[in-house]
Amino acid sequence: MTEHGIKWACEYCTYENWPSAIKCTMCRAPRPSGAIITEEPFKNSTPDVGSMERESGSPLICPDSSARPRVKSSYSMETSTKWSCHMCTYLNWPRAIRCTQCLSQRRTRSPTESPQSSGSSLRAIPSPIDPCEEYNDRNKLNIKGQHWTCSACTYENCAKAKKCVVCDHPTPNNMDAIELANTDEASSIINEQDRARWRGGCSSSNSQRRSPPTSKRDSDMDFQRIELAGAVGSKEEFELDLKKLKQIKNRMRKTDWLFLNACVGVVEGDLSAVEAYKTSGGDIARQLSADEVRLLNRPSAFDVGYTLVHLSIRFQRQDMLAILLTEFSQHAAKCIPAMVCPELTEQIRREIAASVHQRKGDFACYFLTDLVTFTLPADIEDLPPTVQEKLFDEVLDRDVQKELEEESPIINWSLELGTRLDSRLYALWNRTAGDCLLDSVLQATWGIYDKDSVLRKALHDSLHDCSHWFYSRWKEWESWYSQSFGLHFSLREEQWQEDWAFILSLASQPGASLEQTHIFVLAHILRRPIIVYGVKYYKSFRGETLGYTRFQGVYLPLLWEQSFCWKSPIALGYTRGHFSALVAMENDGFDNRGAGANLNTDDDVTVTFLPLVDSERKLLHIHFLSAQELGNEDQQEKLLREWMDCCVTEGGVLVAMQKSSRRRNHPLVTQMVEKWLDGYRQIRPCTALSDGEEDEDDEDE
């Protein structure tokens, strides 16, 4: 016997192995233990039942690893009596009135089709497909399903491999889709074989072709099959999707990622993500594109064309919506002095940083060495009315001004102060983010933003180095304030410490919103009182009251000596989670504006009268008083007079005097304001004809 004759061929890969091998050397398939039947039974003769029983009882060797017996005769008899579904071609049992797979109604046989009898059907059956071939097809597909192809080098790896053996490329995430596609391919092959058997069992070869389904149920089944085929998807489509997403990500910039994070933040209620996007200068009116929606991959939440406002309304984020709506109204072009003169602004920031010092001693708080108060120049009144209107639109926050004046009388409610005493307050526009408090403080003093976080750093360092002093005041004030509203409770020291740690953390985070305690510390850094005029209640964008704001009142630098502080306060406005600087316009200075008060000022000094009572003539609260400093209204008024220059007007309004002088003001601030105002002086408005010109025209006529 030759060498070729003693080898045995593998039934899977046809590799010729040595006689001693019990498995195939190439594919590891087991060696068959006997002859494999390759002849097709029932080829030219009618099968005999007895012979079929004997044949079914004989041992048949199957190349399948599970060694399933190949029972052919009984299987052919059963399939010949089954009926095929006209929708999915599935072979159902004769007693079934509906298809087991797709539930389609069994169709009645047409007159041209003769009923299937056992004899005729068996005689009409052509050479049936050998079950060996069917099992081989199944095994080939199973082997294919047990491997995955590397997308980088196209090497076929085992299913258990976590990465490619050749190039170490990780396993793709679409293994389920690949297996599903393989299963669909296997079922299609088997259905083709079943369909061939069914066609062979038909009595007449010239039967008419069946008409396509026209009923509503048949149409629905077609749609279901189409949707199922689309859901399976292919590996190529999945790879194209991954490639498309990768291209989108490569095109994304930092601003784009901040915008997507803000959108997710609105859905999940994360306000910090929205503030981070706003602080970076992002456009609040930006809409989601198709690529961005595809990248977010949450169709239930995001849709093309949505903005942050749409998402806030959809998910009922009222706090975010209030801030975003304010941002929309401020979307108009703004032009403040700090924007016109960037070089001077940088010099002023360096001056501020150089003027920050730390006091030596037990109370080691930081403070500013210069007293500066920002006012709008009186030369604005010399501009034409149209230019004045343009200037105020670009430098003021009209929404804040309207809310503090019209919606609730908080500022400029006294005609005596606003008209006769020239003490009208104007709300300057600034950034609507967590830094608005620090911006408004620097705007009320130096006329610029806290862009370099110089004031925030001084705030954090003061809170950290003087934590014991401020903590005692804060704890005592919070306890008294709660009891004043009838809330009698006691907290453990650990809870107080946790709340205080949160206040400290806010001071160190750029863009984080600040609280009343931070205003109290800022009063010590400035070494001057801070008066906050604000709304009393938090309200939603629908106008619903949500709670008390607690910001309005007077903040005195009580931990300093009075001799170390200035008595000229600054004013801030608070509306809907936003602080604004309230400044006055320069005036000529009058000696008789305060009833019974002799100001002893020259014409260069501007005196602004800031009311210490609200529109109902109730004294403003003084924040963070100790138990010894608390008292009745007369005692609090006495305390205000000790820390500020106060007087009573002819109308009986208790006011504090804010004094400023252009001559004594910082030269850099004066130069910045003059350069900003020159831009409006050069604007030539479209004026109408004068009276003299009209008369000349009349004479010509």
Curated annotation (Swiss-Prot):
<feature type="binding site">
    <location>
        <position position="167"/>
    </location>
    <ligand>
        <name>Zn(2+) 3</name>
    </ligand>
</feature>
<keyword id="KW-0863">Zinc-finger</keyword>
<feature type="binding site">
    <location>
        <position position="164"/>
    </location>
    <ligand>
        <name>Zn(2+) 3</name>
    </ligand>
</feature>
<keyword id="KW-0378">Hydrolase</keyword>
<dbReference type="GO" id="GO:1990168">
    <property type="term" value="P:protein K33-linked deubiquitination"/>
</dbReference>
<dbReference type="GO" id="GO:0008270">
    <property type="term" value="F:zinc ion binding"/>
</dbReference>
<dbReference type="Pfam" id="PF02338">
    <property type="entry name" value="OTU"/>
</dbReference>
<dbReference type="GO" id="GO:0070536">
    <property type="term" value="P:protein K63-linked deubiquitination"/>
</dbReference>
<dbReference type="GO" id="GO:0035523">
    <property type="term" value="P:protein K29-linked deubiquitination"/>
</dbReference>
<feature type="binding site">
    <location>
        <position position="24"/>
    </location>
    <ligand>
        <name>Zn(2+) 1</name>
    </ligand>
</feature>
<feature type="binding site">
    <location>
        <position position="153"/>
    </location>
    <ligand>
        <name>Zn(2+) 3</name>
    </ligand>
</feature>
<feature type="binding site">
    <location>
        <position position="85"/>
    </location>
    <ligand>
        <name>Zn(2+) 2</name>
    </ligand>
</feature>
<feature type="binding site">
    <location>
        <position position="99"/>
    </location>
    <ligand>
        <name>Zn(2+) 2</name>
    </ligand>
</feature>
<dbReference type="GO" id="GO:0007010">
    <property type="term" value="P:cytoskeleton organization"/>
</dbReference>
<feature type="zinc finger region" description="RanBP2-type 3">
    <location>
        <begin position="143"/>
        <end position="173"/>
    </location>
</feature>
<feature type="repeat" description="ANK 2">
    <location>
        <begin position="306"/>
        <end position="333"/>
    </location>
</feature>
<comment type="similarity">
    <text>Belongs to the peptidase C64 family.</text>
</comment>
<protein>
    <recommendedName>
        <fullName>Ubiquitin thioesterase zranb1</fullName>
        <ecNumber>3.4.19.12</ecNumber>
    </recommendedName>
</protein>
<dbReference type="GO" id="GO:0004843">
    <property type="term" value="F:cysteine-type deubiquitinase activity"/>
</dbReference>
<feature type="domain" description="OTU">
    <location>
        <begin position="425"/>
        <end position="585"/>
    </location>
</feature>
<dbReference type="InterPro" id="IPR041294">
    <property type="entry name" value="AnkUBD"/>
</dbReference>
<dbReference type="InterPro" id="IPR001876">
    <property type="entry name" value="Znf_RanBP2"/>
</dbReference>
<keyword id="KW-0040">ANK repeat</keyword>
<feature type="binding site">
    <location>
        <position position="27"/>
    </location>
    <ligand>
        <name>Zn(2+) 1</name>
    </ligand>
</feature>
<dbReference type="GO" id="GO:0016477">
    <property type="term" value="P:cell migration"/>
</dbReference>
<feature type="region of interest" description="Disordered">
    <location>
        <begin position="198"/>
        <end position="220"/>
    </location>
</feature>
<dbReference type="GO" id="GO:0022604">
    <property type="term" value="P:regulation of cell morphogenesis"/>
</dbReference>
<dbReference type="GO" id="GO:0016055">
    <property type="term" value="P:Wnt signaling pathway"/>
</dbReference>
<keyword id="KW-0645">Protease</keyword>
<keyword id="KW-0833">Ubl conjugation pathway</keyword>
<feature type="binding site">
    <location>
        <position position="13"/>
    </location>
    <ligand>
        <name>Zn(2+) 1</name>
    </ligand>
</feature>
<keyword id="KW-0479">Metal-binding</keyword>
<dbReference type="GO" id="GO:0005737">
    <property type="term" value="C:cytoplasm"/>
</dbReference>
<keyword id="KW-0879">Wnt signaling pathway</keyword>
<feature type="active site" description="Proton acceptor">
    <location>
        <position position="578"/>
    </location>
</feature>
<dbReference type="InterPro" id="IPR036443">
    <property type="entry name" value="Znf_RanBP2_sf"/>
</dbReference>
<dbReference type="InterPro" id="IPR049768">
    <property type="entry name" value="ZRANB1_OTU"/>
</dbReference>
<dbReference type="InterPro" id="IPR003323">
    <property type="entry name" value="OTU_dom"/>
</dbReference>
<dbReference type="Pfam" id="PF00641">
    <property type="entry name" value="Zn_ribbon_RanBP"/>
</dbReference>
<keyword id="KW-0539">Nucleus</keyword>
<dbReference type="GO" id="GO:0006508">
    <property type="term" value="P:proteolysis"/>
</dbReference>
<feature type="binding site">
    <location>
        <position position="102"/>
    </location>
    <ligand>
        <name>Zn(2+) 2</name>
    </ligand>
</feature>
